[in-house]
Amino acid sequence: MPLNSARMNDYRLVLGDKELKPIMVGGMGVNISTRELALEAARLGGVGHISDALTADVSDRLFGTHFVKDKAKRCAPFSGLAPKTDMEFVPEEIERATHLCVEDVMNRKTGDGLVFINCMEKLTMNDSFKTLPHRLNAALDAGIDGISLSAGLHISSFAMMAENKRFRHAKLGIVVSSVRALNIFLKKSSRTGRLPDFVVVESPLA
């Protein structure tokens, strides 16, 4: 087909048993890729991403929760001290915030597309790895269509979700920058008996 006559509707993105328009957008945080962007992509039949970066802050803005204020009060005694290793969110708070953000988006979703969450292994927060299983499983429990794993090797992420009832039903993928990183992820994740539904390659040679 000549490129000058090609249209988006001439192509399809297939993830498992789901056929989609070739649109995959979003994932930037904090709330840069908004729920509105993700919902519009899904309405059009593609894939829209929300971000899991600082869901506590996003939840406070959207739903009137007080996760950030409560953390500030709790960590006030450590203000001015370094290192700030004790200034962190309680994992259960991150779990609740993630659940609220995802549930809200999924309740609003229309169209034949999907809404994913971009889940980063490394975040600019103390001990982000400790919150990772809470973030992953909260998103699944809240009904997210899929998860894109990014910002890290995620060698434990599939294992963290393996007992979740939606682990084998949600679309799960990984963002990598090299074949080496992908091979490491596949080797570790294969122990769960589950392979990723998709791989996103981002690098100068992609």
Label the model's feature ranges:
Residues M1-A206:
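Active-site entrance/lid segments in N-terminal catalytic domains of soluble metabolic enzymes
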